[in-house]
Each structure stands twice: as structure tokens, then as C-alpha cells.
From Swiss-Prot:
One of its GO terms (cellular component) is cytosol. GO terms for molecular function: molybdopterin synthase activity. Keywords: Cytoplasm, Molybdenum cofactor biosynthesis, Transferase. It comes from Phaeosphaeria nodorum (strain SN15 / ATCC MYA-4574 / FGSC 10173). Heterotetramer; composed of 2 small (MOCS2A) and 2 large (MOCS2B) subunits. Its EC number is 2.8.1.12. The gene is cnxH. This is Molybdopterin synthase catalytic subunit. The keyword Cytoplasm applies. Catalytic subunit of the molybdopterin synthase complex, a complex that catalyzes the conversion of precursor Z into molybdopterin. Acts by mediating the incorporation of 2 sulfur atoms from thiocarboxylated MOCS2A into precursor Z to generate a dithiolene group.
Amino acid sequence: MSTSETSSYTPDIPSEPVTKTTDTIHIELTPNDLDSLAATRFVRSPSAGATVLFIGTTRDSFNDKAVSSLSYTSYAPLAISTLYKIASNILTKHACTKIAIIHKLGECPIGEESIVIAVSAPHRKAAWLAGEEALEETKDKAEIWKLERFEGGEGVWRANRDGKVGERVDGGIAGLLGRIEVFADTNV
């Protein structure tokens, strides 16, 4: 779903990080600055011969339009669950050692980190493939949205993935509400 919003709209952002961590997976949605070094430390392991770190930063333009700011929001319980499933599947598929996916919520100034993904694996090819897949799956599936504000005040909410301004989220708001309902029913 995508809508134009007034610049005065403020999404509900948790004041503290929301996390889910095991020995091999760390998932975090945070209003704080992202710590790529902490993500790298988490995935470090004596059994890993490779560590891949991806740091996504906010751009100052989208489709030749000047972006003045970005703000991220999510339905945190569902997004944490989705990100954990993504990480778990990637660990198994690529025989990785550990993975961390950390995403910024709230205002994210231009040039600042919005996502950090760290992956370790016994061999570099698996780590490279896993890191890229983690990013693409996160952008495609995680319940995270961004408000892009453009120079001149116009703002557009859209899915947290590359695409066209105003690109509709699959299933629209009805699809999202259905996913939240199913999540709530299975996690009561």
C-alpha cells in the first residue's frame, strides 16, 4: 500500500529495541543508531572462515526526486517473526554459522544506516549468497514500511523495497490486515 501523507504524521515507533536472539540468530528493530561492529561480533565464530557485512544507507534521491528524509515503521511483533524465519531459512539453506539482521525504525537521516546484515559461514561463497538473500528477503517480506519525504514536502508511504514511487504493497491493506490477524491468532 502506498499513500501520500502530510509531513506532520508520526508513526508509532518503539522507544527501545525489539529483539529476538538465539545462539545463531540475532534479529533487531531499533530506534537507535545501528551498530555494525556489534553485528559483526555476534556472527564471529571459530568455525566460520568468512564474515560478510552489508550496511544499507539512506539515499538522497529516488527516481530523480530529491529525498529530504526517511522514516521507517513496522508492526514489530510480526516483523520480528518474519525476519527470524528468513534468518533461520538462510542459515539452513546456505549452511551458515550465524546471522544478524538489524533494521532502523523511526527517522533515518540521509546517509545514515537503515539496515545491517552480518552473516558468517565456513566458506565465503555461502556467506556472500546468504547476505544478499537475507537483504532481498527482508525487503520483500518483512512488515517494514518507509515514509519517503521529498523536497517540497510531499511524502509517500511504501513498502521497504526498491521500486516505483507509490508501488502498492502486495495484497494492499486487506492483505496486511489478514497477515496481522493470522499472526495474532497463532501467537495468543
